[in-house]
Amino acid sequence: MAITRIGPNQSINLASNITGTLPTGNGGTGATSFAPGKVLQVQHQEITTTVETSSSSFTDTGFSLAITPASTSSKILCVVNLQSLGKAASTTSALSVRIVRTSTDIGRTTNMMYTLAGSTYQTASIVKLDSPSTTSATTYKVTFKNRESNAVHFNAYTGDTSTFTLYEIGA
């Protein structure tokens, strides 16, 4: 590639003098088309209140998102971020969290948090790639339970924000 130097008061017509693909200064590739794997849509939900359960059965957290895939070959990337997972002081707790598509369990943790007596707070994430094989609206939910039958919660502190995000990935 030839290099052209211009002085401070000179100009060059970029439209007629430059050919090929110019690199971008913002981290882009300069590509004009992309291979499969592009994010087609995003659905997002936030919860800012404390959510608690004492149940030993999976209970709704309040996270529920619907997404309508553009193709049966699309994948759905599910990302859950729970802030300030905690429990009552002086109890033993083991928290389990799962992601459910309609009525199908697509991913779970067995012991996202396991603690003995004393207050403990953690931040945790679950990431799951799902293949719903449909173009119909599909609902994903996040549920949780305490395996020790004691109270557990997330968003323990004012200002905590837990999130649930779905990304449709094109095939």
How should these model regions be labeled?
Residues 57, 69-137, 141-171:
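Terminal beta-strand-rich extracellular "head" domains
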Residues 53-69:
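Extracellular/luminal regions of secreted and cell-surface proteins that mediate adhesion/ECM remodeling
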Residues 27-28:
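Alpha-helix capping/hinge segments and adjacent helical runs
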Residues 1, 31-35:
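Short, surface-exposed terminal/edge motifs of secreted or surface/virion proteins that either
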Residues 38-50, 64:
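Short amphipathic
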Residues 34-42, 72, 160:
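A short, polar/charged loop/turn motif at coil->beta-strand junctions and beta-hairpin connectors
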Residues 1-13, 170:
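Short, intrinsically disordered N-terminal pre-domain segments
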